[in-house]
Amino acid sequence: AYPTIRYAYNGMLHRGAYLPGDLFSAVDGMGEERSVLWCEMTDPHGNSCTIESQQGEVVFDVEGIYTVRVCATDEANRRSVCEFQIPVNR
């Protein structure tokens, strides 16, 4: 089975910087934890960026709904990409 990616929060996030591993988790078909490889984020104004998991934080700097696509792979290199709509407030 392909990895399952989960978003760790319910409700709104506050503006600020988060590590991808604090926001998202992934498990493979055997229930083993997998790393999130990258996130593609589009802010409420339509600006996009990609964040490599080992390289930086996901920054939510304006209020609104962000679209975040998250990628994870398992040991067999099967890839899952999930999209989340994340509301951000002050």
Q: Where do the protein language model's features map onto the residues?
A:
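Solvent-exposed, low-complexity, repeat-rich "mucin-like" stalks and linkers
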Residues: A1-S35, M41
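A structural signal for beta-strand boundary/capping segments at domain termini and interdomain linkers
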Residues: E33, S48, R79-V81
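Short, solvent-exposed loop/linker segments at beta-strand-coil boundaries, enriched for Pro/Gly
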Residues: C39-C49
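Aromatic sugar-binding surface patches on proteins
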Residues: T50-Q54
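Short strand-edge motifs at loop-to-beta-strand transitions and within beta-strands
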Residues: G56-V58
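Residue-level recognition of secondary-structure-to-loop junctions
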Residues: F60-V62
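Append "Rare intracellular matches occur via the same short Y/T/C beta-strand/loop motifs
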Residues: G64-E75
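C-terminal edge beta-strand
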Residues: S80-N89
